[in-house]
UniProtKB/Swiss-Prot annotation:
This is 1-deoxy-D-xylulose 5-phosphate reductoisomerase. It comes from the Bacteria. Belongs to the DXR family. It comes from Malacoplasma penetrans (strain HF-2) (Mycoplasma penetrans). GO terms for molecular function: 1-deoxy-D-xylulose-5-phosphate reductoisomerase activity; manganese ion binding; NADPH binding. The keyword NADP applies. It catalyses: 2-C-methyl-D-erythritol 4-phosphate + NADP(+) = 1-deoxy-D-xylulose 5-phosphate + NADPH + H(+). Catalyzes the NADPH-dependent rearrangement and reduction of 1-deoxy-D-xylulose-5-phosphate (DXP) to 2-C-methyl-D-erythritol 4-phosphate (MEP). The gene is dxr. Pathway: Isoprenoid biosynthesis; isopentenyl diphosphate biosynthesis via DXP pathway; isopentenyl diphosphate from 1-deoxy-D-xylulose 5-phosphate: step 1/6. GO terms for biological process: isopentenyl diphosphate biosynthetic process, methylerythritol 4-phosphate pathway involved in terpenoid biosynthetic process. It holds the Pfam family DXPR_C. NADPH binds at residues 20-21, 23, 46, 115, 117, 195.
Length: 377
């Protein structure tokens, strides 16, 4: 057998961090259908779902910071060392995912990146690390995945990158109608099947704020435009200098983006439903930046390049979502908490990882103190 044939038949080894979450769990179907090998996974405390994964993939090594189970190792680092994967799927939610992104880059492992917060809080640091790493980063967000796919063989001069957003469940509501939104309503996304945190981020537009910053770091441009597109069929577009466009379209199903990320955009397997053009109606509208402040905050960052701002936004947002779920604050209070945190901490100097970690910690403390005093819970 020729060497090339050996490589052809070799199973791709996949390590999934955050396997019991929405993205991580969805990846298991792709791993099975693509005939990859799940060599290991991590989870936090969803033991019931983890047990299901263990039964499906009995040879996979496991790490959990809170639960000991079959084939357990003691740390993220040990899990990576013992599995020696070809690619890591970072499907952790929030700031905690930064550690995994840095771990992949430092160990020269390819990365399917669903954890956008890594780039939001430390995009400049990740850019520095990538210069000395052989890792390739494949974005798993549907917008960035589709842009990556459209750009990879393109040689035309680009005028603008366009990403779309559904607007979440409240986009068409008047501002005063947002006053009494509850958590259960906010997690009901009209088009996508997503986890709780990202569903709230979609409802507040923080998700799109973060995706603008993510696109800036991934594609090295400030020329990023967002349009509300209620059908979630067109995920992204590229506008060229001759005013022609390329649009990337599919039914809203995250399996496609996960599949592209894990395969390095090489897979030919069909895992999602085809798009029907019968009675297809596509609508777009400009975002009201006064109503949806997070989009405005993202554009401000692109202009002022204050490294502290995205770290503050992310930490304050994560803490505010917890307070909202606990019914200690209202939906619109999320915006006030983030804005107050930005004003209080935006002059913090950020030059290295230690600064990122300290500002993340200090922002969370600020939110706790401010909210306790303001909302009297």
């Amino acid at each position: 057998m020729l060497e090339g044939e050996k490589m052809e038949n070799k199973k791709k080894k996949v390590l999934v961090f955050g396997a019991t979450g929405n993205i991580g769990f969805s990846s298991l179907e792709i791993i099975e259908k693509e005939n990859y090998e799940l060599v290991g996974f991590s989870f936090n405390n969803n033991y019931e779902k983890a047990l299901e994964i263990i039964n499906r993939f009995p040879n996979a090594l496991v790490f959990s910071p809170s639960v000991k189970t079959k084939n357990t190792v003691n740390s993220f680092e040990e899990l990576l060392e013992k599995t020696n994967p070809d690619i890591i799927l970072n499907a952790l939610v929030g700031f905690s995912g930064l550690h995994i992104t840095l771990l992949a880059l430092k160990n020269n492992v390819d990365l399917a990146l669903a954890n956008k917060e890594s780039l939001v809080v430390a995009g400049w640091l990740i850019e520095d690390l990538k210069r000395s790493s052989s890792s390739r980063i494949y974005p798993v967000d549907s917008e960035h995945s589709s842009l990556y796919d459209s750009l990879k063989n393109n040689n035309k001069e680009i005028k603008e990158l366009i990403i779309t957003c559904s607007g979440g469940p409240f986009y068409k509501k008047e501002f005063n109608e947002l006053l009494n939104i509850n958590f259960a309503d906010a997690v009901k996304h009209p088009n996508w099947n997503m986890g709780k945190k990202i569903s709230i981020d979609s409802a507040t537009m923080m998700n799109k704020c973060f995706e603008i910053i993510e696109a800036y770091y991934l594609f090295n441009t400030k020329k990023i435009k967002v349009y509300q597109h209620g059908q979630s069929i067109i995920h992204s577009m590229i506008k060229f200098t001759d005013n022609s466009y390329i649009a990337n379209m599919s039914v809203p199903d995250m399996k496609l983006s996960i599949q592209q990320g894990l395969s390095g955009y090489e897979s030919k397997t069909n895992l999602i439903n085809d798009l029907s053009f019968n009675n297809l109606n596509l609508t777009f509208s400009e975002i009201d930046l006064d109503k949806w402040k997070p989009i405005h905050w993202a554009y401000d960052f692109l202009e002022n390049q204050n490294r502290a701002i995205p770290i503050i936004m992310n930490a304050a947002n994560e803490e505010a979502i917890v307070l909202f779920e606990e019914n200690k604050i209202k939906f619109l209070d999320i915006f006030e908490i983030i804005e107050k945190a930005i004003i209080a901490l935006e002059n913090t100097e950020v030059n290295d990882l230690k600064d990122i970690l300290n500002l993340n910690k200090n922002t969370r403390k600020y939110v706790y103190d401010f909210s306790k005093n303001k909302f009297r819970y």
